[in-house]
Amino acid sequence: MNICVYCSSSDQVCDEFKQLAAEFGKWMAHEGHTLVYGGATGGLMSAVAEGVANAGGDIIGIIPDCIIEKGRKSDLPTELFVVGDMAERKSMMKEYSDVFVVFPGGFGTLDEMFDTISACMVGEHDKLTILFNPDNFWMGLLLQLDKILKSGLGYKFTRNGNLKVVDTLDGLKEEIIKNENE
């Protein structure tokens, strides 16, 4: 299974989140899953890719020219696609992935997640998105999402169970295994 991970590339992210990302990457490789990610260095992006690489797994990186120009291209992907811009990157990530996992991150992570959710709502795909919420990182966002859903504005997306929220790494693994077996 190709698992897309959206996450922070900031080196200011806490060590706890880096450890979780590395552990998840290691688990992915041991289970025979392929990481699909943004192909850049730093923060959780490096942690998850290093976890996969150190365990002998496969990595698909999809990186736009503008990030390469900043010297942020990772050497870890076993397959690397260079694209023209962020929109093309998101499109390819959706195409190459079977499930999406959202680790803690900032505006780029949110952009990727909402793009994926919106694409699901309009029928471009019916793939699962899992919001990983360690240490209640996404609590404020979850309150707003709950308000959106209660107002009926996100019905199409959640009706099919395409958005899951998990608080632990074990919970994340369980959701992926369930999705794989469906």
Regions found by a protein language model. Give the residues of each.
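A cross-family phosphate/adenosyl-ligand binding-site feature
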Residues: 1-96, 135-181
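Active-site/ligand-binding-proximal alpha/beta "capping" segment
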Residues: 88-124, 130, 182
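Short, glycine/charged-rich beta-strand-loop motifs at protein surfaces that mediate ligand recognition
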Residues: 129-135
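A generic structural signal for well-ordered coil/turn residues at beta-strand boundaries
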Residues: 125-126, 159
